[in-house]
Amino acid sequence: MARIELGKEGEKLAIDYLLTKGYKILEKNFRTPFGEIDIIAKDGNFIVIIEVKRRLSDKFGKPELSVNYTKQQKLKKLALYYISMLKKEYPVRFDVIAINDKKIEHIENAFF
């Protein structure tokens, strides 16, 4: 399976999972001049910035481990950009959804 197809399928699995958990999906593949946020959702009062990582095996490590410090810093900047567009302040949370084959692990508050 091509990398882009794998990512798109992973994002669909993640969205389906989030909807079953009661999240409201606000944005998918939110693009800015600085990069992209996979999913932006609302969970209660929180705006949740969600990075989705999918792998077919652990051969190259667990998917969640690829959300390293550099990626975290980038997501924080992208979140500030998104929040600045809103008319109201919301608490923000950063989650990672790691999918290994089709097994989903949702890591809430993955980083601050």
Swiss-Prot record:
Cross-referenced InterPro entries: Restrct_endonuc-II-like, tRNA_endonuc-like_dom_sf, UPF0102_YraN-like
Family: Belongs to the UPF0102 family.
UniProt xrefs under Gene3D superfamilies: 3.40.1350.10
Organism: Thermodesulfovibrio yellowstonii (strain ATCC 51303 / DSM 11347 / YP87)
Disulfide linkage: none
Pfam families recorded: UPF0102 (PF02021)
Domain of life (superkingdom): Bacteria
HAMAP family per record: UPF0102
GO molecular function, one term: nucleic acid binding
NCBIfam families recorded: PRK12497.1-3 (NF009150), YraN family protein (TIGR00252)
Identification of the protein by name: UPF0102 protein THEYE_A1950
